[in-house]
Amino acid sequence: MSGGWMAQVGAWRTGALGLALLLLLGLGLGLEAAASPLSTPTSAQAAGPSSGSCPPTKFQCRTSGLCVPLTWRCDRDLDCSDGSDEEECRIEPCTQKGQCPPPPGLPCPCTGVSDCSGGTDKKLRNCSRLACLAGELRCTLSDDCIPLTWRCDGHPDCPDSSDELGCGTNEILPEGDATTMGPPVTLESVTSLRNATTMGPPVTLESVPSVGNATSSSAGDQSGSPTAYGVIAAAAVLSASLVTATLLLLSWLRAQERLRPLGLLVAMKESLLLSEQKTSLP
């Protein structure tokens, strides 16, 4: 009887413990749901990021809502993924004052590259060129200004070398910035130049024999002294003779079957013995 009652008490305890665990689990799930409520999509979120969320110094991309610096707007570089920062950019040709709006205040580059719509600055038609300072010269095909003293100095200073064109003549540059004046050409200057180029030292009879004597004496010195070519030729002939004799000796020894392993040494010893015997004989 007591055993059955103890079994029932154990079962009740197990059931109560399981119920308590279930209650704790349900309470934890409820607290988690209260901490992070489910968000429902609204009409504003479905339409995209709200406009005006970026500060006044920023530009908001239309699709991503990213805020980029306002200076990146209409700078011909896609900073937004949808390219909205380069849309509705008003670009007009350069005006006579050398301005390309927008943005105002930026000078027309006048670099020969079509930076504005219509290519008006490509041929420098609507671009104003800055004037050179006093005492300076503008290059013909560029906006570079160089000092007038660099004109016709023998060194090209302009990219197109226009500062060295027309030197020595009364030629006016295409830009009209400077005129180069050369020295006046007179009859006396032409006559003096011709005399300087054609007239040489006077030719006399004394100068002609002296040249001939010098030539003959140098030739006699060369013929009287032995040259090194004969010595070199003799040495070459002697070397060739020695090589030929050596080759003939080796061929003869090979024909006599004496040029075998240690055969050459034996032959040399025999030749030495023969020479000693010949010298010992009276």
From Swiss-Prot:
Interacts (via LDL-receptor class A domains) with TCN2. Ca(2+) 1 binds at residues 72, 75, 77, 79, 85-86. One of its GO terms (biological process) is cobalamin transport. GO terms for molecular function: calcium ion binding; cargo receptor activity; cobalamin binding; growth factor activity. Pfam families: Ldl_recept_a. This is CD320 antigen. One of its GO terms (cellular component) is membrane. Glycans are attached at residues 126, 195, 213. SUPFAM superfamilies: LDL receptor-like module. It is found in: Cell membrane. Its main location: membrane.
